[in-house]
Amino acid sequence: DMSGLIKKGEVGSILNEVDPVRVNALQRVAMEESRLGIPLLMARDVIHGFKTIFPIPLGQAASFNPQVAKDGARVAAVEASAVGIRWTFAPMIDVARDPRWGRMAEGCGEDTYLTSVMGVAMVEGFQGDSLNSPTSIAACPKHFVGYGAAEGGRDYNSTFIPERRLRDVYLPPFEAVAKAGAATFMTSFNDNDGAPSTGNTFILKDVLRGEWGFDGIVVSDWASVAEMMAHGFAADSKEAAMKAVNAGVDMEMVSYTFVKELPELIKEGKVKKSAIDDAVRNILRIKFRLGLFDNPYVDEKRIEELYAPSHLEAAKQAAVESAILLKNEKETLPLQSSVKTVAVVGPMANAPYDQLGTWIFDGDKTKTVTPLKAIKELVGDKVQVI
């Protein structure tokens, strides 16, 4: 019962609600029926577009043009905020150099500097000129840190990154977005040399807050607090909650160890009340910066802003700039006019949904154009297309 949990003050953020009517109804419960009246923070993975879809981040990075990334994030923010989303779990700025790793497409590749520049551009696009604008959404750079260096390219796996390499290769993109004003950070699933990021005081307190002066929200990745048990870093959910909070995690995503375990941990003195106060301040600070206390509701008429012509034009331009051209050394192109039959082959030839790319929740496959369809429309009845 989501409304019941909100009334009891057990929910501060909600994932994946994209119906503006429902968003407003849940906000009304929080504002009018809970004891403290603190607005909810609505979140969604908006990675490379909301309704208007842009090239995958790896493709955007191939443009070598940060304006492409910034424009894409700005369009995504306008559209996502139109349904009540005010927080996205992006950009992913994990430097990744092992192509076996399954999330390469969500990042910007192997280069630290390019990842830094594109990451900053995305943060600026998502957050706009001011976080309290109703068309801005809080960015959440992820996964902090070293997630893309998982041993053997196996997701969630351990990493073994010495501090010098950490500072030379993997930390710089995160430092860049922190200094660019990123509102939130997400911890990563991996452990580094035995210490999972979600329970790693060195990176969360010493580096992120101490060295870089970050004062926003640190959120765990999906159940990554509980995942510390799988890493052998915590014996049970109680120890996992203790280590996460004491390391500097403000908000737990999905798993329920904070709600379940923190009251007892505080009584036992294993978690100080000051740690809870710090976490609450960090969360409230971002909600204030987003203007949620002034206006927690979304204008339901804004849904008309989806698929605006200017948004589609920006996506087209991004696709053009992201294209990788091959040398025409043997003059394969252009096809000679004598050709009467063209075969369009491959798994992507006529797959409408796959044209959207990875990590898409809200794109509409009926609005895509497959290579097969496009080529048929281009050549008409002059050539047989199979």
Write out the residue ranges for each language-model feature:
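Glycoside hydrolase catalytic-domain context in secreted enzymes
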Residues: D1-I386
